[in-house]
Amino acid sequence: MAFRGIVVLASALFVQSALSQCVGRAGPGLGGYRGGWDGFGYDGLGYDGAGYGWNGRLGCGGLGDDIAAASALGASHGGTLAVVTSSAAPTGLGIASENSYEGGVGICGNLPFLSTASIAGELRTGGTGGIDYGCGNGAVGITVESVISPAINYAPAGAPLGRSFNRGCGCGAANPY
């Protein structure tokens, strides 16, 4: 009888731990007030409990605090369950080009599942450049190549503009890009 009780208790603990993982950063602070770093603080309604918003998206963090398209895509973060990743290189589909392009180049296509895009090689000493990558909608496009960052940082999928500092309303740490 004691064994059955232990099995029921262990099952309840496993279910509770699986269902009590982080639900995402879109909610308005579901935990109780515990200072500035939990509940209504760091992940909730305000930075340090002062109402500025960090990941709660009601203030300085804004909607651009993470990739807007990927935050709603369950495959990119595991939904409500924790995701464990490794540093092993992915295997499968790989696309590489050893070509040199001059002038205007137009590339169109879709890659399946979640993937990455990168450019490597020598860039001009002047000019602009970048990669426009939409996670989850299949849109990958090299838009521009740049050495100098633009004055306005563009966010994907309808996220608000950041004015060369962090995201959202433009306050926070300096832009590392």
Swiss-Prot record:
One of its GO terms (biological process) is chorion-containing eggshell formation. The keyword Magnesium does not apply. One of its GO terms (molecular function) is structural constituent of egg chorion. Disulfide bonds: none annotated. One of its GO terms (cellular component) is egg chorion. InterPro entries: Chorion. Residues 1-20 form the signal peptide. It comes from the Eukaryota. Pfam families: Chorion_1. Keywords: Repeat, Signal. Belongs to the chorion protein family. This protein is one of many from the eggshell of the silk moth. This is Chorion protein ERB.1. It comes from Bombyx mori (Silk moth).
